[in-house]
C-alpha cells in the first residue's frame, strides 16, 4: 500500500480511471470495438498497428483504445505541471468517417460532465503530420478553455498511401482532460483512483518518480552508442523481413516502431545534426512506406 494515501470524499466518476471507463463505454455504444494498447514503446496512439494498417485500404474499421505514449524529449524531471515524457491517450479510429463525427465527440465530453455551453470549446485548425510514418491529415486541435485537450484528424495519407475512404482519428489527452474535470493545476495532483474506503491514489503517487528518473535517463545517462546500434539494427531487421517471400508485415512494422523509439531517445540527447536527423527520418519513412505499400497490395 502506498504510504502517502489521502482520505477525502469525492465523486469517483471524476477519477482518471473513471474517465477512461466512461470513454470506453461511450464509444463502445457507438459500435467501436474496444481493443488493448500496443505493447511497445510508442510516441502516440497513432503508432498502434491497428491504426497504421487499419487506415490502409477500403475495409471499414471502428476501434477505440487507451495507449501509453512516450516522448523522451518532453521530460521535465517532474517539475512541469502539465508536460510529461510518458502519458496516456485515448484513441478513436473510424472509417469511413461518420458525417456527425464532431457531434459524437462533443457528446462524449457531455458524458464526462463537461458542459459544452458553459465551457469555451474551440476547434482550431491544425493540420497534422507524422514524417516517420509518411502520414498526414487535415484537422483541428480542440481547445477547452484555452488548453488543447484533443487532436481531431481526417487522415489523407498513411505510409504514403492515399486514404480512401477517409479515416477519422480522435486523440484525447487524458491528463489534461482530467485536470480540467478535477480542477487541478498540477497533473501530479490528479486523482487516479479511489477505493471503497475512500483511499485515494494520485497521478503523482503512481508516476512522479518514474517521470523524474526517466527524464534523467533520457537526457543524461542513456547509452547513446547502444541506442544508435539498436536503432540501426531494428531498422535493418524491418527491411530484411520485408524481403522475405511471405512478407511478414506485422513483425516488420514492430521492428520499425522499435527503431523509432531509439531514434527518439537519441533525438532527446540531440545526437543528430540537422542533416543527419533528416536523413534518418527519410530512411524510416521509406521503410514505413514499403510496409504500407506491401500491405495495400495484399488487400487487393
Swiss-Prot record:
UniProt-listed PANTHER family: GLYCINE--TRNA LIGASE, CHLOROPLASTIC_MITOCHONDRIAL 2, GLYCYL-TRNA SYNTHETASE
Family from the record: Belongs to the class-II aminoacyl-tRNA synthetase family.
Biological process (GO), any one: glycyl-tRNA aminoacylation
HAMAP family the record matches: Gly_tRNA_synth_alpha (MF_00254)
Organism domain of life: Bacteria
Gene3D superfamilies referenced in this protein's UniProt entry, alphabetically: Bira Bifunctional Protein, Domain 2, Class II aaRS and biotin synthetases, domain 2
CDD domains in the record: GlyRS_alpha_core
EC number(s) recorded for this UniProt protein: 6.1.1.14
Protein known as: Glycine--tRNA ligase alpha subunit
One annotated GO molecular function: glycine-tRNA ligase activity
Catalytic activity field: tRNA(Gly) + glycine + ATP = glycyl-tRNA(Gly) + AMP + diphosphate
Key word Cytoplasm present: yes
InterPro entries for this protein: aa-tRNA-synth_II/BPL/LPL, Gly-tRNA-synth_heterodimer, Gly-tRNA_ligase_asu
Keyword match RNA-binding: no
GO cellular component, one term: cytosol
Subcellular location: Cytoplasm
Cross-referenced Pfam families: tRNA-synt_2e
Keywords: Aminoacyl-tRNA synthetase, ATP-binding, Cytoplasm, Ligase, Nucleotide-binding, Protein biosynthesis
Subunit field text: Tetramer of two alpha and two beta subunits.
NCBIfam families: glyQ (TIGR00388), PRK09348.1 (NF006827)
Amino acid at each position: 500500500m502506498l504510504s502517502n494515501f489521502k482520505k477525502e470524499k469525492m465523486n469517483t466518476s471524476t477519477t482518471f480511471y473513471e474517465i477512461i471507463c466512461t470513454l470506453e463505454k461511450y464509444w463502445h455504444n457507438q459500435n467501436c470495438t474496444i481493443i488493448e494498447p500496443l505493447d511497445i514503446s510508442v510516441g502516440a496512439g497513432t503508432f498502434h498497428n491497428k491504426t497504421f494498417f487499419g487506415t490502409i485500404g477500403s475495409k471499414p474499421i471502428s476501434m477505440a483504445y487507451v495507449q501509453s505514449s512516450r516522448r523522451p524529449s518532453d521530460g521535465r524531471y517532474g517539475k512541469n505541471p502539465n508536460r510529461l515524457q510518458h502519458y496516456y491517450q485515448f484513441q478513436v479510429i473510424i472509417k469511413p468517417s461518420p458525417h456527425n463525427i464532431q457531434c459524437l465527440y462533443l457528446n462524449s465530453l457531455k458524458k464526462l460532465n463537461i458542459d459544452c455551453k458553459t465551457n469555451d470549446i474551440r476547434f482550431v485548425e491544425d493540420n497534422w503530420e507524422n514524417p516517420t510514418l509518411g502520414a498526414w491529415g487535415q484537422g483541428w486541435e480542440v481547445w477547452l478553455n484555452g488548453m488543447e485537450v484533443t487532436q481531431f484528424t481526417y487522415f489523407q495519407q498513411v505510409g504514403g498511401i492515399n486514404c480512401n475512404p477517409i479515416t477519422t482519428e480522435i486523440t484525447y489527452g487524458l491528463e489534461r482532460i482530467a485536470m480540467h474535470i478535477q480542477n487541478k493545476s498540477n497533473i501530479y495532483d490528479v486523482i487516479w483512483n479511489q477505493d471503497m474506503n475512500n483511499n485515494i491514489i494520485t497521478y503523482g503517487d503512481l508516476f512522479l518518480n518514474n517521470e523524474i528518473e526517466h527524464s534523467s535517463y533520457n537526457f543524461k545517462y542513456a547509452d547513446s552508442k547502444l541506442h544508435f546500434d539498436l536503432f540501426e539494427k531494428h531498422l535493418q531487421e524491418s527491411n530484411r523481413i520485408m524481403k522475405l517471400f511471405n512478407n511478414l508485415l506485422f513483425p516488420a512494422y514492430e521492428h520499425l516502431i522499435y527503431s523509432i523509439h531509439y531514434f527518439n531517445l537519441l533525438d532527446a540527447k540531440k545526437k543528430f545534426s540537422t542533416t543527419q536527423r533528416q536523413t534518418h527520418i527519410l530512411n524510416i519513412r521509406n521503410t514505413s512506406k514499403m510496409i504500407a505499400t506491401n500491405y495495400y497490395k495484399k488487400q487487393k
